[in-house]
Regions:
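AlphaC helix of the eukaryotic protein kinase fold
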Residues: 57-90
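Conserved end of the kinase activation segment
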Residues: 205-216
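Conserved activation segment of eukaryotic-like protein kinases, specifically the C-terminal portion
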Residues: 191-205
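Protein kinase catalytic-loop region centered on the HRD/HxD motif
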Residues: 144-156
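Activation-segment/catalytic-loop signature of the eukaryotic protein kinase fold
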Residues: 102
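Conserved short submotifs of the Hanks-type protein kinase catalytic core
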Residues: 106-120, 124
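Activation segment signature within eukaryotic-like protein kinase domains
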Residues: 140-141
């Protein structure tokens, strides 16, 4: 029988107490579905489905490793994925994706999450390239730091912070989604797998020196996401920077357009030496919440000039 990698579960499929509506996302590590529970509430379900290791036989829902060697790696990754779901289920914070259930089925594992409506920061960046206000950046990232602080309090790391994993709800509040810790663990321990971090947003220690991972690793990714919010594209990848650092500092690129404080903070977060970065999310959050340092927008500056002229003329 023919096989296809990453064959999605069919629409309408009954998965435990959930009914699959449709596939809504996925990558090399997993698939994500919109589903409904028995109360007809929408949920998102992430299925552990690493395309490098497994195939789903056409017409079947079961997941099978593509070789005996891959089966051992797949089983180890499944354990990492399941443990990540268990850990995330302990976190109930408005700025962190809520994991409500996790279970085994179809010879793999699933993570059930609250379904959020809105768009990613990446979509916002693409729609407003070069025109994103500092007030928006500070508000979104300061709130996200609340969520990241909670994650770090639980002795967890995100390890895949980037604009496409920062979701902005319809009410404007942000939420951290799609944790990368299980992917990172698997790719570090199984060298035959392609790296599962995101170039440009991954810290240098994610490429090497895994023993040096810490809160500062996520802080590098926050800095890269801040940089991308201004530039519209990610900074130079950290492994390339280690060989030949061509990254133009934020303080050079956007001086005069954004506050010096914000630009200096971005550059500090993107230090290759992890000891030179902010060491805690709290210290970074304090800076982001300091709106007194914010540079007035061009619109507000023009408005103040017009008001001044009006007073002089009339």
């Amino acid at each position: 029988m023919a096989t296809q990698p990453n064959q999605a579960l069919p629409n309408g499929y009954r998965l435990n107490e959930y009914t699959i509506v449709r596939k809504i996302g996925g990558g090399g590590f997993s698939m994500v579905y919109l589903a409904r529970d028995d109360n007809n509430q929408s949920v998102a379900i992430k299925e552990y489905l690493p395309g490098q290791l497994v195939l789903r036989t056409e017409g079947s829902v079961l997941v099978q490793a593509s070789s005996t060697e891959n089966n051992n790696i797949f089983r180890h990754g499944m354990k990492c994925f399941f443990e990540e779901g268990r850990a995330l289920a302990c976190i109930d914070h408005p700025n962190v994706i809520r994991v409500t259930n996790f279970f085994r089925a179809n010879d793999t594992v699933y993570m059930v999450m609250r379904f959020e409506r809105g768009k990613t920061l990446q979509q916002h960046i693409q729609a407003n390239r070069g025109t994103i206000r500092e007030s928006f950046i500070r508000r979104v990232f300061a709130q996200l730091m609340n969520g990241l602080r909670e994650v770090h309090t639980h002795k967890l790391l995100h390890l895949d912070i980037k604009p496409s994993n920062l979701y902005i709800r319809l009410d404007g509040s942000p939420v951290l989604i799609d944790f990368g810790a299980a992917r990172q663990t698997l790719s570090q321990e199984e060298t035959k797998l392609q790296p599962m971090y995101t170039p440009g947003f991954a810290a240098p220690e994610q490429y090497h020196n895994r023993e040096r991972l810490g809160p500062w690793t996520d802080i590098y990714s926050v800095g890269a996401s801040l940089y991308a919010s201004l530039a519209g594209y990610p900074p130079q990848a950290a492994d390339a920077r280690l060989l030949n650092d061509n990254l133009v500092p934020a303080t050079v690129n956007w001086r005069g357009a954004y506050s010096d404080q914000l630009l200096e903070t971005i550059d500090q977060c993107l230090k290759l030496n992890y000891m030179e970065r902010p060491q805690s999310v709290f210290s970074l959050q304090k800076v982001l919440m300091d709106n007194t340092a914010m540079k007035p927008s061009r619109t507000s500056l023009l408005t103040s000039i017009k008001r001044s002229l009006s007073r002089e003329l009339f």
